[in-house]
Amino acid sequence: MQGGDYPDVVHLATGREAALTEQFIKGNLIADITDVLSMTVPGESKKVSEKIAGGFTDTSLTNPYGDGKTYLAPMFYSPCGLFYNAGFLKEKGWDVPTTWDEMWELGDKAAAEGTYLFTYPTTGYFDAFFYALMYAAGGPDFFDKATHYEEGIWDTAEAQTCFDIVTKLASYTNPITPAQANDQDFTQNQQLVLDNKALFMPNGTWIVGEMGEAPRADGFEWGMTALPAVKAGGDQYSYTWFEQAWIPAGAEHLDAAKQFVAYLYSDEACKLFAESGAIQPVLGIADDLDGDNKMFYSIYDNGAKAAMGNFASFTAIPGVEVRTVFFDPVNSLVSGSTTEQQWIDGIKSASDQMRANIIE
C-alpha cells in the first residue's frame, strides 16, 4: 500500500497493536461510505440501513470525524463483559456481583480459598472494559465528554470513580497476569479462568472458540456478566465491540467495493459468517443462535445496557496512542511499579495533546 496499490475493501478493526486502521483514519485515507447505507442489499429488497441494528452506524467507530458521515462499516459485533466459570461459582455458592462493592466482597472470599478475583488477556482488553465503566460511572454524557478529552473531565468525581475501581481491581488481579499479557502468551491468562485461578476476565464472545481445545476444570461452564453497577440500583453496562470494514480512498474499483460492502449484510453472507461464529450486527440475528451464543447475545435482554463508541480520533502524535496512555499502564498498576496518581497524570497530559489534535 505504501506504493499506492490499495485493496478495494479492507476488513481490519481498530484497536490492533499496529494501529493500521487508525493511521488511515488520521490520514483521511478512508472513503466515505454513507451512500452504502441507502443501497439495496444485493439479491434482497431491503436497504443496508434497514438491516443494520440501531446505533451501529452512529458511533465514533464508524463516523470518526464527527461530520455525520459513515466511513467504516460495522462488522461482527460481540457483546463484551466479564467472563467466568459459572460452574465454579455455583459449586461455591457464590452469586455473580451486580455492584462493585459485591465484587470486592467476592474477591475477599475467593482470596481466602486461593483464587484471585481477576485477570485479563492483554491490556488491550481494557478498552471495552473502560468504556463500559465510564458509562456506568457517568452515563452517556460523561462518556462523550471523556472520549473527546474535554478539559477538566479527568478531575471529575465520575473519572475518579473509574480510576479508583481499576486501581483497586489491580490489587485483586492474579500477579502473573502482566508477564503473560502480550500477543504471544495471552491465552495463558485466559487459561487462569478455566483453571479457577482467577474468577473473572474481560473478554468477548470469541473466547469460546479461541479456548475451545483448552483443558478446563471439572464442571466448567461459561458465564458472562455485564460490568457491575457503581452503586446499588445503578445501571450495569456491557460494551458492544465490533470490527470494521472500510474502503481505502485510493481503491481502484470504488463502486464494486461499495456493492461488496452492501453484500456483507445479506442473509446469505450473515449465515456464512455465523457458521464460523462471526455475528453480523443485523436485526433479529440472535433469534437464530443457540448454546453459549444465545446466552451471550441475550445479555441486553437481561437488564444490561449497551455501551458503544470509543475515544475520538486525533492526528498522529509521536509516541501517543490511546492504548499506551489509558490501558497499558494497568500492567504497572498490577505489578506495583506505577501509582494511580502517576497513571492519572499521564492521562491528563496526553489528553491535552489529544484534544489539541482532535480530528473534527
What are the roles of these predicted feature ranges?
Residues 31-52, 138-161, 213-217, 229-237, ...:
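Short, solvent-exposed loop/beta-turn-alpha elements that line the ligand-binding surface or hinge
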Residues 106-110, 148-181:
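Glycine-centered hinge/linker elements that transmit conformational signals in sensory
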Residues 22-23, 115, 129-133, 137, ...:
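Extracytoplasmic/periplasmic substrate-binding proteins
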Residues 1-20:
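Early extracytoplasmic/lumenal segment of secretory-pathway proteins
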Residues 32, 206-213, 227, 231, ...:
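Mature extracytoplasmic/periplasmic domains
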Residues 147-148, 238-239, 279-284, 298-355:
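C-terminal capping/gating helix-and-loop segments adjacent to ligand/active sites or protein-protein/ligand interfaces
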Residues 17-79, 104:
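Hinge/lid segment of periplasmic solute-binding proteins
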Residues 60-75, 80, 104-152, 189, ...:
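Extracytoplasmic/periplasmic solute-binding protein
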